[in-house]
Amino acid sequence: MAQTGQLQIAHDQDGSRERLALSGELDVVTAPALDAAVERLLAGRVESLILDLRSVSFIDSSGLRSVLTAWDSCREAGCELLLIPGDGACLRLFGITGVLDDLPLWEPKSGDGFAQLDLA
């Protein structure tokens, strides 16, 4: 697990899906860590990437830029991106900025390997 400033990024895998689970603040200071983590995964030819934002307590425009950049990078790499926004800061910002309906949102079910966030 990587920790930068007030952001923790955990990486795990379930079958063909890779997950980056974020916890803390996604802002101008910490967004580059997300950019780097996505870039590292995509260099390994990932088929499906889940960006789990349920435990993000704060996100600013830099964090939004990183999420949108991850989406673009995944499309360019032929990788499916699934976002789990949770019901907090990320969902609010996505709605306010008008990107909510465009983003590839995903809600894990109880049988999915990523149903629960575990950053312990």
Q: Model-predicted segments: where are they?
A:
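STAS-like cytosolic regulatory interaction modules
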Residues: 1-57, 68-120
